Amino acid sequence: MIDLHCHSTASDGSFTPTQLVSLAEECGLKALALTDHDTLDGLGEFRRADENSPVECIPGIELASQDAENSYAGYHIVGLFLGAEASEEMQRLMQRCIEAREARNLAILERLRHHGIELSLTEVESAAGGEVIGRPHIAQALVNRGVVLSIQGAFDRYLGSGKPAYVRRRLPSPETAIAAIHSMGGVAIWAHPFTRGNYTVRRIHEMAVHLKGIGLDGMEAYYALHTVTQVKNALEICEDVGLLPSGGSDFHGAVTRSIRLGVGTGKLNVPDSILADLEACRDQRASAR
């Protein structure tokens, strides 16, 4: 069993990269990919943990992107097998992501003020505890203030899509995300395709064709929140379009307590057999560089 999608404290997870590797060993995983949101910051520690672990540790990332030319809600692109050195292309993209996230955070605080909630950036930084600040930390600051009872309550009332303090983040195009992943020798995977909007199988197929045309290598067919039917449909799309199937739990630790590493809600089983094709794709890219 393998898990090619999880998050650490370098983004919005509650386990450090080292703790994730230890947990993967306890779970009996053959391979684990660390795919933090829009950052490479946890990969150094992840690689060091790999030195003494029987688990194959695969350096990765998850990049949020938006295609301005269609109405799709957005694509999350996972990069697997990233090289040790960040490419100039990836560094530029990371800087854009940082600037966009910081601008969004300030805009959210301004909207909260407009609704009578004076929340300072210092309070949010305290809630983040040194992590990259995002909406979950603003939510925690609202909990700390007593404005809401829970993080989920903060999203339901203020921070979720369509709520009073929601601010859409400026995102790179999927072409840019895929190219940045390839610039580091990585394999580009469309993450959790059936969870980003209420789309038909036909529509998902159309999106897969579009992404394949701009360089996508694979699609996350196995995913913690995919139904059995969705897994089947995703595998059929991969076969039809010529994409490699991938899969993972999207484990965040305490942030999503119902999702466990390796097994998701308990039914996830990402087969070891898909790893060979993904590694072959990585090797093919390396030989072409």
Predicted regions and their residues:
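Conserved, well-ordered active-site substructure
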Residues: 259-271
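Extended substrate/RNA-proximal surfaces in nucleic-acid metabolism proteins
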Residues: 49-210, 268-288
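A metal-dependent hydrolase metal-coordination microenvironment
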Residues: 1-134, 214, 220-241, 245-256
